[in-house]
Amino acid sequence: MAVENNTQRSYSIIPCFIFVELVIMAGTVLLAYYFECTDTFQVHIQGFFCQDGDLMKPYPGTEEESFISPLVLYCVLAATPTAIIFIGEISMYFIKSTRESLIAEEKMILTGDCCYLSPLLRRIVRFIGVFAFGLFATDIFVNAGQVVTGHLTPYFLTVCQPNYTSTDCRAHHQFINNGNICTGDLEVIEKARRSFPSKHAALSIYSALYATMYITSTIKTKSSRLAKPVLCLGDLCTAFLTGLNRVSEYRNHCSDVIAGFILGTAVALFLGMCVVHNFKGTQGSASKPKPEDPRGVPLMAFPRIESPLETLSAQNHSASMTEVT
């Protein structure tokens, strides 16, 4: 009987997942692919001063030569929250004290007449799926900002190698709008025009903050008071150091890293609070009692005082009834 009370029939959850959510996810991944791997979106050509000291830092090499390479970054920021959510959900499901509250918040879904979707499977797919969507969405926002602004990296003039003997560069305070003045490698120059906001900073803080919100909202540890702070602060510190590494290697300006942190934080907070509702179950809000309508409540209640006339009338009525009987 308890299983029947905790079961909800739904014929739309699987079609909605296949034809709506998977389509949106595929479109997001496809758009991120076009930003990353194709020349569909051309970078804005931003002008510069030939003697700008902020753009004359030494060339740090390719991204693969960085202390935090893109491959290592993407693997860590994708695997860490996924592993935390997977291990956390399985642990809570098999621990008796947390399993009861989990079942109370999340109902078993019956699709058709034979297929059951357990609360464990639904929560894992929901939380990891939203995280993956936010990861690609953050990447799209970053690439869009870099393409639109065309902000120059600190080493731009080093790889641009402008012709300083030309008429345009002879004047120290002349602003150069001509992109053809550069004589360096065109591929490296194009990458040097994509600095704002910092992709490493945005993705790292998004991943760290999403994992931190999950840990603080779902994992309950009464025996240890320092386990959760260590995990959360460790993730946030790693993201912070990733941004500092971009500045120390002259790959981004401080403003680029700060903008990346703000962007990643905004996406993580929006998804964590407004989409997955602080990682609570779908039945969590339904169990709260509805507030009483204030229109039906009197502004002030006074005690009722019985009138002497009413008392005398009641006594006479009872006496008359006695005489009749």
From Swiss-Prot:
Tissue specificity comment: Highly expressed in the brain. Also found in the liver, kidney and testis. In the brain shows a strongest expression in the hippocampus and cerebellum.
Carbohydrate attachment residues: 5, 163, 316
Transmembrane parts of this sequence: 13-33, 67-87, 127-147, 201-219, 226-244, 257-277
Chain positions with Phosphoserine modification: 307
One GO BP annotation of this record: signal transduction
Location, primary (coarse class): membrane
Membrane topology according to the record: Multi-pass membrane protein
Entry's localization field: Cell membrane; Cell projection, Neuron projection
Gene3D superfamilies: Phosphatidic acid phosphatase type 2/haloperoxidase (1.20.144.10)
Coiled coil: none
Keyword tags: Cell membrane, Cell projection, Glycoprotein, Membrane, Phosphoprotein, Transmembrane, Transmembrane helix
SMART domains per record: acidPPc
GO-annotated molecular function: phosphatidate phosphatase activity
One GO CC term, this protein: neuron projection
InterPro entries: P_Acid_Pase_2/haloperoxi_sf (IPR036938), P_Acid_Pase_2/haloperoxidase (IPR000326), PA_PP_rel (IPR043216)
Keyword rRNA processing in record: no
Induction per the UniProt record: Shows a transient down-regulation due to overexcitation of neurons induced by kainic acid.
Biological function: May play a role in neurite outgrowth and neurogenesis.
Family named by the database record: Belongs to the PA-phosphatase related phosphoesterase family.
Protein name in UniProt: Phospholipid phosphatase-related protein type 1
Gene: Plppr1
